[in-house]
Amino acid sequence: MKINVHAGHNPDGKTACGAIGLIKESTENRKVKNEVISLLKTLGHTVYDCTEDNGKSKSDVLKKIVTKCNAHKVDLDVSIHFNAGGGRGTEVLIYGTNSGAYTYAKNTADAISTLGFVNRGVKNRPDLYVLKNTNAPAMLIESCFVDSAEDVNRYNYKTMAPAIVKGITGQTINNTPVQSNSIYKVQVGAFSKKENADALAKELNAKGYKTVIVSESK
């Protein structure tokens, strides 16, 4: 797939930054965005980061994001946000039920809810600038609520991002360590005189290293 991904809003501390509660939206959505992009690229997808960090106003941020998104021909635009206002859980916003993003949105909400978040489902928001003006189908993910202690205690960008990626692609990354039958040895020195080898072995033993002296023919 070819996918645009961006974190909504300016960074924290600037005009038009995101919601602030127990955590800060503009900090966390950038963490999630970076991890999502990394995972998607690992899975072989083409990804463009369309985040805007220097908008002069809310409308300027939105316009610049859409301009960046529309510069690429992609299958999907993904906008990462966090919610606020006293609720709990995750929801994904799209332009309308007939949007090409609907299935991605539903799968993403379902995937995030497996982390323990309330599933608020997919909601139509044709009034939102990004959803209305991107060329490709777009979805806006409200990951969880920044002002909900329950959500914040459950949230971790390292688990949120893989859930989003699974919702988009249906793919997961296997983090199970690969078993190896190989043994790796480290050689420190080689000497023609045994007393030199003995001296180095004694020094290493004193430092806590286990040593073995091996004799080989020249």
Describe the residue ranges of each PLM region.
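A structural signal for isolated positions on well-ordered beta-strands in alpha/beta enzyme cores
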Residues: 2-4, 48, 212
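Solvent-exposed beta-strand motifs enriched in subsets of small alpha/beta binding domains
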Residues: 8, 177-218
